[in-house]
């Protein structure tokens, strides 16, 4: 089969100064994309003065390999920063076709020690940061009737993790974000998907043993992300997991449940096994489809408040 190429496409990769973002940017550029390499250059917890040093190094790597890229050091945690990142792409290359929202920080603490600042900063970078960059790019994609968006969740966002109530919550928020982009972008050939990577990076270097990190190279995740950014990708609103050579799909599903007319507390207790049984669980494409299921149950039982 033919090689997947990105000639003529313009991509923005946030948090691309190292780790996953760097790997994504290098792979896109190697396949012909013009890449905006965005990285604030701060510390892992989001502190430190902005610097383009990390982004510049990745741009140098791309150019040395014959690719085309430009560095950007704006922060994603403000609307002005997001607009500026997109303007960097427009000024350099005239359009935006692809956004990989990868920028992230960590401020891990056990829940009882978590501060409001720790909570707010994580949401500012991961959730608002994705919004700040994707929205101005999305407007351009609508005008051009083409776009590919990949936002980055985490297995912590899917399943939770000790000491990461802020991070897990922010990463879960991005699932609903991407699902809505799928619905609103469908008419304009905009595909939005979610990646849940497990990879060695600044964010994981002291979380996993060195032997495990060696097997979890970012380069093993990037082919999945870059495929989702390609014209050949036909799916949208999906969650994919990747790491260590494993690639899978995750989904939010709902059990068949139990239909209970005007249920009492005891009815819930007596049917709890059936309610909780995930055999034959269903996946819904949007919120309305799930509501329809409940309305059908209400019609069958004649339930009332």
Show the residue positions of the predicted features.
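A glycine-rich helix->loop->beta "capping" turn
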Residues: 6, 65-68, 88-101, 107, ...
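Canonical Rossmann dinucleotide-binding motif of NAD(H)/NADP(H)-dependent dehydrogenases/reductases
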Residues: 3-37
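A short, exposed helix-loop element centered on a Lys and neighboring polar residues
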Residues: 134-135, 179
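Residue(s) in the substrate-gating loop at a strand-loop-helix junction
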Residues: 154
